[in-house]
Amino acid sequence: MKICVNRAEKLGRYIDPTRWQNSTLRYSPPEKFPAYMSGQIGRAEIMRTWITLDEYFDYRTGTFYPDYDIGVARYPVEELHYPYDWKNIVPAPSGTRFKAYLTSHAKEADELLLNVRRFEREVSDGVITYDEYESIFENAVEYCKKLAPNIRYIECCNEVDIRSFGNLTAEEYSKIYLCAYRAVRRLNEKHSYDIPLELGGFAAAHPIACWDMMREVVERLKAAGVEMDFYSYHHYETSSTIGLVKKHKLDIAGLSAVGKIRHLLSIHNEMLADFGLPKKKIFLNELGRSRTTGIDGDALYNAAGIITYLLAFGCSDDPDIYPFPWCTFHNPELQISFTQFLLCEDGSFAMTPNGVAVKMLHDLSGERLGVTVKDAYARDSEYCAVAVEEDNVIDILIANPSGETVACELEVAGMPAGDYVLTRYLCDSHFNNCVTAKKCDGKSIEKTADVIRKVGETGVFKHYFVLEKDAFTLYRIEKQ
């Protein structure tokens, strides 16, 4: 793989693509975590948060639990009307309750997106009425907005196209969405919020594979005189490919990850045009490369992909689609593949490769330089590297999201003759990887090498190195 940086090609200021992040409720972190997180990867412009209606309200007794104990089922799973994802839920060791979870994340974000989920099957199956669901939804959102006034976006349900989250039809989801629409409209009228609530959805797990469902939902809402204020989709590359193959959409399954997301944007905009609807924000608010696993090696695999996805879609003040990597904190036994941070036995936190990748992207600053990548094994190779310059210091982030160990050649053109210090910060299976490398504590990103490189009259800086599969590295070049 050859990475060519042209110092003379200025592309404008680098824009941080990590400004949109996900929290998790299923394995809530300690109350101190959001402040720590923002110190590492920056304050979120939008943080996605959650409330689970079946934990907030017991429809059997009519009791509300405003500060509920997260992840503790009120009844044995076999006694529930529908199991949802309860089999994968364990109470987090943090013991964080709902109020602390929501307010601690609200303090570290400009705005919140609140996903409201569960009771999808209860209302669809007639266990509770639509009027009851609407009242519960309104009560929950009003309570959360009081705790966190910076909530702007309300997301109606999550991944209802799969079994763990309700397995709804378009008709069933549309009825639920209209309940949420009426509830949000009343709250906005009642309170005249400084930050009005906006409602959207439906956070589809496999949006391309179930595109007919999305079109039907939008068509049904339009017939009711309702438009979504924003749209939300998810993309997990491995699962997306499998889902598309199962649907016999082999041509789309064969696209690269970036290609699939661009295809999603294309059919989304076609849908809006077909129905005569205006463009609204599109949140890709769960994004990953790996499967959902507890396999240690999948953390590095996912991180390398996240770098390319964020560079492809996040480096804009007004992106076509807002990428939210999944996720800042989760149960490592179930989602080591995705979580950016871990809770250590002493109560401190450690960065996984996903956290290292996000932090490296966040910490870049300066004028973006032109970069070309040649002879890469990886797909979407144009997003495998980014270079910036600030005060004559050049930072270059390079990822190898392929299944091969590759020899790499780095060239930087336009350098004055002289000696340069090249500092390397490598993340692979051995370095800056607290998941697979026992010597790494994950507290900071440690430099892994310093070398001197001489630039002659040609003005070309050259360096040769090797990246193992799915490794990534940050190089810093400074005049000696």
What label would you give each PLM region?
Residues 236, 287, 328, 399-402:
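Histidine- and/or cysteine-centered catalytic micro-motif in compact active-site loops
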Residues 119-121, 159-162, 204-209, 287-292, ...:
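Short, internal active-site loops enriched in acidic
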Residues 241, 291-292, 326-340:
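Flexible glycine/acidic-rich beta-alpha junction loops that bind and position SAM and/or redox cofactors
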Residues 1-153, 167-207, 223-227, 273-279, ...:
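Non-catalytic accessory regions flanking glycosidase/transglycosidase catalytic cores in CAZymes
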Residues 293-310, 342-345, 349-356, 364:
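Extracellular glycoside hydrolase catalytic/binding regions
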Residues 172-309, 316-319:
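Noncatalytic carbohydrate-binding groove/subsite architecture in carbohydrate-active enzymes
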Residues 28, 53-59, 119-123, 157-164, ...:
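Conserved radical SAM core fold
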Residues 60, 124-126, 165-167, 242-247, ...:
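Short acidic, glycine/proline-rich loop/turn micro-motifs
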